[in-house]
Amino acid sequence: MAVPKRRTSKKVKNQRRTHKKLHVPGMVECSNCGELTKPHRVCKSCGHYDGKEVVNG
């Protein structure tokens, strides 16, 4: 069975995990109501996308 020969230091362990962080999604302002939404998606508050109403009510 494989067993580590030396203890993994905190530095090496943390360097290996640098890509496991959470990323904050980019947000854009809705052109109709000004609400923050994810880009290329329909606004949840007003239902507009690309300057047109897509969802009613």
From Swiss-Prot:
GO cellular component, one term: large ribosomal subunit
Cross-referenced Pfam families: Ribosomal_L32p
Keywords of this entry: Ribonucleoprotein, Ribosomal protein
SUPFAM superfamilies according to UniProt: Zn-binding ribosomal proteins
Segments for region (Disordered): 1-21
GO biological process, one term: translation
GO MF terms held by the record: structural constituent of ribosome
Superkingdom of source: Bacteria
Family statement drawn from the similarity comment of this UniProt entry: Belongs to the bacterial ribosomal protein bL32 family.
HAMAP family registered for this protein in UniProt: Ribosomal_bL32 (MF_00340)
Protein name: Large ribosomal subunit protein bL32
Organism, as annotated: Oceanobacillus iheyensis (strain DSM 14371 / CIP 107618 / JCM 11309 / KCTC 3954 / HTE831)
Record gene name: rpmF
